[in-house]
Amino acid sequence: MKKKIHKVTFLIDKKNNWIKSYLSKNNLLFKNRYSYKFSNNIDTIVDQDILFIVNYTKVLSDSFLQGNRLNLVIHASDLPKDRGFAPVANQVLRGKNEIYISLIEANKKVDTGCIFLKQKFYLKGTDLYDEIRSKTAIAMIKIINSFLKQYPSKINRKFQKGKSNFNKKRTDKDNKLNINRSIKKQFHILRLSSNKNFPAYFYNQGEKYILKIYKDKKK
């Protein structure tokens, strides 16, 4: 008897699609059991066995979610802690190096769905923006593959328990440095700044200065 090939789609925000290149480079496993596709257009997604919602910030309607058998959100925090936007960045700002990845069921209320899996990865405290992003992506791929290995026979849901908090969307102001504070006290802000897209900056005597950060590769 021919095995069923489960249809899997990754819904990725068009304006926040950096994860796609990692998913492409790091082969998704179990291709004999799953067919994979990527989309940033919900109109092209229907009747999927599994929909992974990755870095997608728009609200999805109940009717859309009901059109798929299982809708999963990958969220980089120890839910119910750090619901909302930029969970990794907000944890880095608090000095955390142990970061969880939660795989949850999508529902109407943001980041409140039942938990299927939790895994964690570690930062060094010296990682810069690109390194943090890379480690996050690798951890996301790992939890995806772990779930696909278990599906459909060995999956369990657990309700979220404990205190929760909700992080607001980060803005340009979050990259602003205070020239009256030390670099050490603001190092996490520098770590989270993207030299290309949103570098750190400060004002002095009415002028705005851009500050970019690199590791010395010569040492």
Question: What kind of feature is each model-predicted range?
Answer:
Residues 1-219:
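One-carbon transfer enzymes
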